[in-house]
Regions:
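Membrane-interfacial loop-to-helix junctions in multi-pass transporters
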Residues: 45-46, 129-131, 168-172, 263-271, ...
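Membrane-embedded helical hairpins/re-entrant loop segments and their flanking transmembrane helices
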Residues: 8-13, 37-57, 274-347
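Membrane-interface helix termini and inter-helical loops of multi-pass transporters
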Residues: 149-163, 216-228, 260, 366-372, ...
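Flexible hinge motifs at transmembrane-helix junctions and intramembrane kinks/re-entrant loops
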Residues: 40-43, 166, 179-253, 273-288, ...
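Hydrophobic, small-residue-rich membrane helices and short re-entrant helix-turn-helix hairpins
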Residues: 187-202, 253-275, 288-312
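C-terminal ends of transmembrane helices
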Residues: 4, 54-66, 109-123, 179-190, ...
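Early transmembrane hairpin of solute transport permeases
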Residues: 15-174, 362-366, 372, 376, ...
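Interfacial segments of multi-pass membrane proteins
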Residues: 81-87, 185, 335-350, 356-361
Length: 430
């Protein structure tokens, strides 16, 4: 792929801010939603802070050669729920989040040591292109239902948690967003091609705003796409105050400190069982993601800086991120898709996004704005991002002879099992 900005290229400062914002918008919704799913008072702002810090740790370990952002991992949602379920208090549950993330991170550290000692040839034999290709495709295709579901859902919910706006109106906003991204990426001039998602989200948000304003004026719920109520957090007793614009996130370690006196060997064992098996599953995704980004930037990241460094960056980054936000981190397909579609692989954009995530986590207005972006707008964006991830995986199969039964069965089994959602549960762990 011909890149506009290579990994080590540094855009001008003004452009860098916009490119970093684009990366941030691409990953932010998913990063913020994991704490919401877990509940128990977890802070989305703290998770965003943890993702930013974790990404910087990852960049340091990979010598700033791998342009990908780390965000909250959905794979550990069951593990995180088990941490709270097994804790006798909220403080112990929060401490469990950190200990569990350390267990998961140590899996990566151990594998990294093995890779450093014996090399990566065994990885290539264990996971050749005929395995990696469909695995990458499954990562994108398994997210397809999320994108299409979001595309017909608005941001304003009723008491039952259902979207109040018409699915057709939401779909119009999603299509406006998607078409804007496609037009900018395909026909736009240089700058437009570099920031199609910023422009697309802006166009979709504007469309949703128009519908919502009309809906509010005419009192028609079917047109109310955006939930402007999230901006009420900027008011303190009906007045604007400095404290409503700046707030320190509720970091996980602050609550976790009170859990040490309740810690028991049995609970630690529960955490080990909940987190360690999932870490091995996410390890396969780690390989697939780095094979994918390697193909995009035309540089083998498993050799330079090396798989041991990417694993250490991901593992230690997850540990550090969980200390602040409670969520183990992982390389984000949305970030990789953003790099590929915009052809901007500058690692400085990733660094800028990480720093931006840290700063923004303290700024209530920006967090409120991101929370106000309706699902349909992000659904339009994700249709492009997830689709590109799937296509990237299929492209890896271009040199594979699918006329050979051995290859055909490997690819078909992975695709059907992955897209079909095959899963095995052990207690509360899936």
């Amino acid at each position: 792929m011909k890149l506009i900005y290579g990994v080590k290229d540094k855009p001008k400062f003004g452009q860098l801010i916009i490119f970093s914002l684009q990366q941030l918008l691409a990953i932010m919704t998913a990063t913020l939603v994991v704490p919401v799913i877990i509940g128990n008072g977890m802070s989305s702002a703290a998770a965003l802070f943890g993702a930013g810090v974790g990404t910087i740790v990852y960049l340091l370990f990979t010598l700033f050669r791998s342009p990908v952002f780390l965000g909250s991992s959905f794979a550990f949602i069951g593990s995180m729920s088990a941490a709270f379920a097994g804790g006798v208090s909220m403080s112990l549950g929060y401490l469990g989040l950190i200990i569990g993330a350390v267990f998961a991170g140590l899996v990566y550290v151990v594998i990294a040591i093995v890779v450093k000692l014996v090399g990566v040839k065994w990885i290539n034999k264990l996971m050749p292109p005929v395995v990696i290709g469909p695995t990458v495709a499954v990562i994108g295709l398994s997210l397809a239902s999320n994108a299409t579901g979001d595309a017909v859902s608005g941001g304003l919910k009723n008491a039952a948690g259902a979207s109040v706006c018409s699915p057709l109106i939401a779909l119009i906003c999603a299509i406006v967003t998607l078409l804007t991204v496609i037009i900018c990426s395909t026909y736009g001039k240089k700058m437009a091609k570099l920031i199609p998602f910023v422009i697309g989200i802006g166009a979709g948000y504007l469309c949703a705003t128009v519908f919502t304003v009309i809906g509010n004026l005419a009192d028609v719920d079917a047109l109310k796409v955006i939930n402007f109520g999230v901006f009420s957090s900027l008011l303190d007793n009906g007045k604007v105050a400095l404290s409503t614009f700046f707030a320190v996130p509720d970091f996980t370690f602050l609550t976790a400190l009170g859990g040490f006196k309740e810690l028991s060997p049995a609970y630690i064992g529960t955490l080990a069982v909940a987190y360690i098996p999932v870490a091995f599953v996410v390890f396969a995704e780690h390989i697939a993601d780095h094979e994918n980004i390697s193909a995009i930037i035309e540089a083998n990241l498993l050799e330079n800086p090396g798989l041991h460094r990417t694993l250490l960056g991901d593992g230690v980054g997850s540990m550090v991120g969980a200390i602040f936000g409670g969520c183990p981190n992982t390389t984000y397909g949305e970030s990789i898709g953003c790099v590929a579609i915009t052809r901007n692989a500058s690692v400085y954009s990733i660094l800028g996004a990480a720093i931006g995530a840290i700063i923004i986590s303290f700024l209530t207005p920006f967090v409120a704005f991101v929370n106000s972006i309706p699902s349909c707008v992000m659904g339009g964006v994700c249709m492009a991002l997830y689709g590109f991830i799937a296509v990237s995986g299929l492209k890896m199969l271009s040199g594979i002879d699918l006329g050979e039964n051995r290859n055909l069965f490997v690819v078909s089994t992975i695709l059907v099992a992955g897209i079909g959602g095959l899963s095995v549960s052990f207690g509360k762990i899936t």
